[in-house]
């Protein structure tokens, strides 16, 4: 098979600022892929967070790896060899920056020659630190990846994201790399806390595949459907950088 026909895409969350809901985005993206008829190879590179809500907590099929072990990011490429899935979805942990930067500097061009494309997902709230984390990753990754930016309202419905829109360096980033930008709805705090406590996905609640009385309430099923639809609409808009 000629290298140019490999056609694989590796999607990974930027492991910068913690607590911005990057794992929730990855979990919902996996559900979106299922709707497209794709079952992505799943990598959990945030094993230090496994007891508190890493990818494998919600999606047990995710393979765990220690990002700080030498050669771990080569699993991006190993996963491209496994099975028939054209997509690899990896959730990175906080503090993943240096290892990722070094790997891309050494391997990204070669991977691209083999037909492997990359998409980096940056999730930000309306906090300067989470915005700066995205910009820091872009400084290192440059145009070796496509960018999907998720503006997470967190607990601020209809947030205007002034830190994102008013930061001059963000405007430079947008001009240089033309990222896809989408929004993530603010979630009711009790709903989100129980979602994480019980390691459930929006898909499970929306489809009624839960036993807990709290999540069988109609109001919470409606919430799950609404939150998921907003995310899916954003993924639909970005499908050209999410599919091979």
Regions found by a protein language model. Name each.
Residues 3-12, 26, 35-100, 117:
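Nucleotide-state-sensitive switch-loop elements of NTP-binding domains
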Residues 72-75, 99, 106-109, 169, ...:
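Exposed alpha-helical structural elements
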Residues 148-156, 163-244:
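P-loop NTP-binding site
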Residues 95-194:
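Conserved catalytic-core segment of NTP-binding enzymes
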Residues 22:
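Conserved lysine of the Walker
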Residues 16-19:
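Walker A (P-loop) phosphate-binding loop of P-loop NTPases
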């Amino acid at each position: 098979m000629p290298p140019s026909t490999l056609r694989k895409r590796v999607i990974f969350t930027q492991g910068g600022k913690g607590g911005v809901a990057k794992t929730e985005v990855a979990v919902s993206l996996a559900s979106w892929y299922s709707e497209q008829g794709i079952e992505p190879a799943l990598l959990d590179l945030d094993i230090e967070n496994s007891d508190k809500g890493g990818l494998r907590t919600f999606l047990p099929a995710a393979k765990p790896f220690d990002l700080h072990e030498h050669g771990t990011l080569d699993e991006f490429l190993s996963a491209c060899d496994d099975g028939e899935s054209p997509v690899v979805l990896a959730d990175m942990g906080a503090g993943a920056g240096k290892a990722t930067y070094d790997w891309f500097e050494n391997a990204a061009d070669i991977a691209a020659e083999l037909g492997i494309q990359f998409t980096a997902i940056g999730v930000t709230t309306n906090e300067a630190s989470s915005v700066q984390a995205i910009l820091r990753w872009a400084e290192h990754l440059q145009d070796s990846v496509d960018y999907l930016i998720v503006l997470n309202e967190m607990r601020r419905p209809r947030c205007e994201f002034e830190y994102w829109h008013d930061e001059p360096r963000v405007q430079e980033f947008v001009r240089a790399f033309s990222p896809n930008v989408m929004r993530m709805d603010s979630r009711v705090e009790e709903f989100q806390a129980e979602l994480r406590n019980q390691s459930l996905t929006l898909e499970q609640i929306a489809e009624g595949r839960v036993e807990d009385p709290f999540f069988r309430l109609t109001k919470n099923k409606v919430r799950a459907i609404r939150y998921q639809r907003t995310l899916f609409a954003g993924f639909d808009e970005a499908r050209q950088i999410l599919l091979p």
